[in-house]
């Protein structure tokens, strides 16, 4: 697998998710993760256990939004609540084995879709695109952290 495509997968997920990139499920049960679950699970995979407050801050959304999303993921068995490993009083979420499995499946579908979209691109072009997309997403995050421009 092209390493640049794998690195590009998460960046592309933040920007868009087009139906033509996704392959139908072989089982036909469409157990795909929605975008918010995918992004939250990816963050937990990268950062380790996080509280609702930490997730809320990381994504710049209200804690009520994260609470709703995390409750759905808890019910689906994708995350579990654990005591803070650092001894804090807030409970944290971490991936379950099912959550990790579903995240890996979804990531595999995304990578295969990106490989189809980028077929014929050189390694250099793919790497440049990944770098520009990372830069674009970082700029979007920086602007959202600053809030709306003054009127």
What are these regions (language model features)?
Residues 1-36:
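N-terminal leader segment of winged-helix/HTH proteins
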Residues 64:
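Key DNA-contact positions within bacterial/archaeal DNA-binding proteins
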Residues 39-45, 101:
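Pre-recognition alpha-helix immediately N-terminal to the DNA-recognition helix
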Residues 3-11, 105-151:
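Terminal interaction helix/tail motif
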Residues 30-37, 96, 122-123:
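Short helix-coil-helix linker/hinge
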Residues 47-51:
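Short capping segments at the starts of secondary-structure elements
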């Amino acid at each position: 697998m092209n390493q640049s495509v794998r690195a590009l997968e998460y960046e592309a997920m933040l920007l868009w998710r087009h139906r033509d990139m996704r392959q139908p499920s072989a089982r036909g049960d469409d157990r795909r993760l929605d975008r918010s679950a995918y992004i939250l699970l990816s963050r937990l995979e990268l950062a380790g256990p996080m509280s609702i407050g930490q997730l809320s801050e990381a994504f710049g959304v209200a804690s009520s939004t994260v609470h709703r999303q995390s409750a759905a993921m808890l019910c689906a068995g994708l995350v579990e609540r654990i005591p803070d490993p650092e001894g804090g009083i807030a409970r944290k979420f971490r991936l379950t084995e099912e959550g990790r499995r579903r995240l890996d499946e979804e990531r595999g579908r995304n990578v295969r879709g990106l490989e189809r979209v980028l077929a014929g691109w050189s390694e250099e072009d793919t790497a440049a695109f990944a770098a520009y997309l990372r830069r674009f997403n970082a700029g979007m995050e920086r602007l959202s952290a600053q809030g709306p421009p003054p009127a």
